Amino acid sequence: MSAGTTRRAVLAAIAGLALAPLAHAQDPRASEAQAAARAWLAIADKLDAEASYEAAGPRFRQALTPSRWNDAVKLIRFPLGALMQRTVNQTTFTTKLPGQPDSDYALIAYRTSWANKNVGRELLTLERVGGKWQVVGYVIQ
């Protein structure tokens, strides 16, 4: 092996070690939960309180009336303006949430920018119901 070939092999090995964590497959639960969250957020981003309420999971609908959800959308989400950018910061899973029955929950934190708020956080809680992830909590910070 020539010196150039050896150097390239060593550099390739170092690059492979450096990039190895990126090559691991993402937890399939994270992909599924994030896809469900994106679908729900696409509805919420249209400021359609009725449709986002209907698309949410049963615990969401049990905790809020359609009227209260509509008021929250008008008071909190509407003033933020159009979505500019949304990036997943973290997705975690748990079976226990304070004040809730044990179940499969996904907690997804986003870094989000809107036209009228440069940087904020969105926190979504999803529950696996009937094999599907459904939004059961939504907070903007």
Indicate residue ranges for each PLM-predicted region.
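Short solvent-exposed beta->alpha transition segments
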Residues: Q34-A36, E50-S103
